[in-house]
């Protein structure tokens, strides 16, 4: 029996969003870039893994740059011009991702580090000995 033709869902409507917020989460293993509007609704996102990198290569600065470029490209299609950048995490892709957003054509108005720091909360895990 033939399968019925697959109906594609509604396409995401193109919205004109002139300014927003870029959230960069940079860990040692991956970098995730989410670009939202000022209310926090996600407009575009990308990660090193979604950009085609696997394993240890996801943690590299080049992977972060590629992910940021992909997210910025989609945000520019939605009409975004200015962004604030919120960076979270200790990873190596922090600066490269910010630079990639700037080179892509987005005007950066603010850069803020929002890495959570404990005020002596939970006990740290034991030190790794290699």
Curated annotation (Swiss-Prot):
One of its GO terms (molecular function) is structural constituent of ribosome. InterPro entries: Ribosomal_uS11, Ribosomal_uS11_bac-type, Ribosomal_uS11_CS, Ribosomal_uS11_sf. Part of the 30S ribosomal subunit. Interacts with proteins S7 and S18. Binds to IF-3. Located on the platform of the 30S subunit, it bridges several disparate RNA helices of the 16S rRNA. Forms part of the Shine-Dalgarno cleft in the 70S ribosome. This is Small ribosomal subunit protein uS11. It comes from the Bacteria. NCBIfam families: PRK05309.1, uS11_bact. Keywords: Ribonucleoprotein, Ribosomal protein, RNA-binding, rRNA-binding. One of its GO terms (cellular component) is ribonucleoprotein complex. Belongs to the universal ribosomal protein uS11 family. SUPFAM superfamilies: Translational machinery components. The gene is rpsK. It comes from Synechococcus sp. (strain CC9311). One of its GO terms (biological process) is translation.
